[in-house]
Regions:
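Active-site beta-strand/loop segments that form the cofactor-binding cradle
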Residues: 3-5, 9-11, 110, 114, ...
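A short core secondary-structure module
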Residues: 3-42
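Short, solvent-exposed loop/turn segments at the edges of secondary structure
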Residues: 11-13, 25-26, 55-57, 87, ...
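Secondary-structure transition/capping motifs at alpha-helix termini
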Residues: 22-27, 103, 107, 111-124, ...
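Glycine-rich beta->alpha junctions and the first turn(s) of the following alpha-helix
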Residues: 42-144, 184, 225-229, 233-238, ...
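Acidic/histidine-rich catalytic neighborhood
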Residues: 129-177, 182, 189-191, 208-250
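C-terminal helix-coil-helix/basic helical segment that borders enzyme active sites and/or dimer interfaces
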Residues: 141-189, 202-203, 307, 329-361, ...
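Glycine-rich phosphate/cofactor-binding loops in nucleotide/flavin-utilizing enzymes
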Residues: 197, 208-281, 379-422
């Protein structure tokens, strides 16, 4: 007996997966419940939503609904674990779904900009529009790189567990669970990229973008739920850092030793030698390594300062999570682009190289901003000066990329193909 809100597909579902508490059990249990009106099940009216109008969303009311014991999903009291794992799967699936929408919206924007003429010039030839479509494409490429990476990691982990004698079901559960952090990071990054891309798509369309007759209006409304689905982005941000710290505390990953090495490095004299940057991505790899040091520096200092009460400092966790997101997304794009350069030849990957370099440049800006925010929040005096100097050292470029040129390169390829083409 009870009610559930915001149930997707409730209007036509034949079966419900319901999580409920049996009597005074501490933990919840999962059930398979047929949607039968003669068994105490009634539905509320269809919700009037901001977006996703074609989906059915209703309340479900249970009034002394009888559920046979054989309809229990797994074991009694194991519902929370099932629910959490379904969220992990849902998060990476949401990321993949958003990516398809990002590609379509980017293509719509490029096609409209190639047709719309202002001052006797197609607006795709204006640098203000080139910048927009280049960033839209870059965020899509990077998000896709990270999603493929996580999906392959999960697939490999499932196979390893299955080959070791685990059942396929157990292998899937554990495989996804081991990459729960990555699933959360992807969900946050890509749902927010989707929102930004839809917003910029409207801007490219101008006044027409505000019309319900163009595809941008529904894209903007429909994508807003992505930041709320499968746990809000704020919850997922804090979860990702929290899970990482818990893994370190349990000894599942070595976090303390690398953090200590970074702290020791900060105490030493920095090298002023200019490294050899002739090899492809030499500078990008060096910067990426240093960005990881920033995360270790800040998370290590936070743990040292607050211990197990770090979770209470939510703004700090949110900022550190943003740093973690940028590191994972940047590394994913770099790995993909480098692999394809080696496989297909560097000359075939000009635009992908440009997108990787452009994204890293943006990531460094974000990490500098978030890093300062975190450092100033919990430190003072010499400690603060040391951490800020470390942040400056670890975000150093030896040769700054020409980001305007990078954006123009990407935009010209989009114009040539008249769609998202990467």
């Amino acid at each position: 007996t009870g009610q559930k809100m915001w149930i997707s597909n409730a209007g036509f579902a034949k079966l419900f997966i319901v999580f409920a508490r049996i009597e005074d059990d501490k933990n919840i249990t999962g059930f398979i419940v047929p949607n039968e009106s003669n068994n105490g099940i009634t539905l509320g009216d269809e919700e009037k939503k901001l977006g996703i109008h074609s989906s059915s969303t209703r309340q479900v009311f249970f009034n002394e609904t009888k559920v046979p014991v054989e309809n229990m999903l797994s074991r009694r009291g194991s519902g929370f674990k099932i629910a959490v794992n379904s969220l992990n799967v849902g998060r990476i699936k949401l990321a993949a779904a958003c990516l398809d929408a990002q590609k379509r919206v980017t293509s719509y924007a490029v096609q409209y900009a190639s047709e719309r003429i202002q001052f006797n010039t197609k607006i795709i030839d204006f640098e203000a529009i080139k910048e927009k479509v280049a960033i839209m494409a870059t965020d899509t490429y990077v998000g896709e790189s990270a999603t493929y990476r996580a999906a392959k990691d999960i697939e490999d982990r499932i196979k390893i567990r299955h080959d070791s004698g685990n059942s396929f079901q157990e292998s899937e559960l554990k495989g996804v669970e081991e990459y729960a952090i990555e699933c959360s990071l992807l969900k946050v990054a890509i749902s927010e990229d989707m929102q930004n891309i839809a917003d910029e798509g409207i801007q490219v369309f101008g006044g027409m973008g505000f019309s319900a007759e163009t595809p941008m209006e529904s894209a903007w409304r429909d994508c807003r739920i992505g930041r709320i689905y499968e746990g809000t982005n704020e919850i997922n941000r804090m979860l990702s850092v929290g899970m990482l710290i818990k893994k370190a505390m349990k000894g599942h990953i070595d976090f303390i030793n690398p953090a200590t090495k970074v702290a020791d490095e900060l105490m030493g004299i920095p090298s002023f030698e200019v490294p050899d940057l002739t090899e492809l991505f030499a500078q990008e790899k060096l910067i990426l390594t240093n960005l990881k040091k920033i995360f270790l520096m800040l998370a290590g200092a936070g743990i040292k300062k607050f211990g197990d009460k770090l979770e209470e400092h939510q703004q700090m966790l949110l900022a550190v999570s943003d740093i973690l997101i940028e590191i994972y997304m940047t590394e994913s794009a770099l790995l993909r682009t480098e692999k394809n350069c080696n496989r297909l030849g560097k000359e075939t990957q000009t635009n992908q190289i440009a997108m990787t370099q452009l994204y890293l440049y943006k990531a460094v800006d974000i990490i500098q901003s978030k890093g300062k925010e975190v450092i100033v929040s919990f430190s003072s005096g010499d400690e603060q000066k040391g951490l800020l100097m470390g942040l400056k050292r670890f975000t150093k470029y030896y040769e700054y990329p020409n980001v305007i040129e990078l954006k123009n390169i990407i935009a010209e390829k989009l114009k040539e193909e008249n769609k998202y083409c990467f």
